[in-house]
Amino acid sequence: MSFDTSTYNEALADAASILACRLPSAERPFFYLHLGAEYDLAGFFDAPPAEIPLHELSPSLPRARTLDGEETRLLAGRIEGVPVLASAGARRVADGHGALAALFPTALASIMGVKNHIFLDTAISLVSEFKAGRWGMLADYVSDFAFSPLEGLHGMLDKPFPDLAHTIDQSQNSEILNAKADFGEPPRLCIYHGIPGFHLPTSAEAARSRAIGADFLGHDLVLHVILSHALGCHVSALVLAGVQLLPGFPRSFTRDEMRETGLFCSGQLRQGLRRAILEVRRASEGYAENILPESDADEVLCRNIKLSATRSSPLKAFLRREPPTQEPT
């Protein structure tokens, strides 16, 4: 079986009911993380998460493994005490099962009320600033897909014509940037260019992406970002430079090389992401450190050095006194 837009809503509703019964906690997840096959997930969660193969939530979902040889599955657990739902082994449109199947986890998290989304992907760096292993954070993106992930899904949207000018949530981005700065070099803002397929690009494709201002060249990330924002979610996206493809330096590389970079950088990602999730949760709850009220410095000093009227200062003997003035006779 496969999806069409007329049955997509019903399939999502059924999957949400099944998933709600299988979550380890009755508390609704606060975060949704979308992870590719490149990252080592050991230690991401406070304890081993519950794992649910995605195809068990709907008969219309494919059972076949992804092009990376992964089984797409949902992980449910806690990170720094915050309930999180994650999708691991992301399926891509190029797998051949359609965009609706690839986007199913993102849409499912949205309709379940999980409104804070972070997407992670490994892509090809096109500029010298992003060396292999360097993280970027999406400030904007360009999509070359011939279709929109919203086609036929307008019944799910609050607005049939969503404004994509502010897709990325800058407030959430700030919390993530600050958190990751404590664990190495913070990610830099970047422009992501998404193209169809799942291939390693030609030099001409890379040059065209640079010409439109892109820092990274990748694939399906843009589709998830658009759908998530259109469904009313707070969206952030981190992209890792798996390899670097610079002008004038043509080179050959493999998908395995990109995956190795992702595995190598998983530790830094894990530390920064755990802190970021906690900080975003605190910010959403209006958490703030206790800040002392402003005081006048003179009043503070006076209050702290004032002597009791019943006690004398041990320095009293050293006080200078002016001699008494004598009135003229």
Segments from the language model and where they lie:
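Zn-dependent metallopeptidase/amidohydrolase metal-coordination segment
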Residues: 220-258
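Metabolite-binding pocket within alpha/beta catalytic cores that recognizes anionic/polar moieties
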Residues: 1-164
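Short acidic/polar active-site loop segments enriched in Thr and Asp
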Residues: 115-116, 215, 234
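His/Asp/Glu-rich mid-to-C-terminal helical/loop segments that flank catalytic regions of hydrolases
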Residues: 245-298
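Hydrophobic/aromatic ligand-binding patch that stacks against planar heteroaromatic rings
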Residues: 108, 208, 225-227
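A short, charged, Gly/Pro-tolerant segment at domain boundaries
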Residues: 283-328
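Active-site/ligand-binding-proximal alpha/beta "capping" segment
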Residues: 173-174, 178-215, 280-285, 289-293, ...
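Histidine/lysine/aspartate-rich catalytic loop segments that bind and position anionic ligands
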Residues: 141-142, 146, 151-198
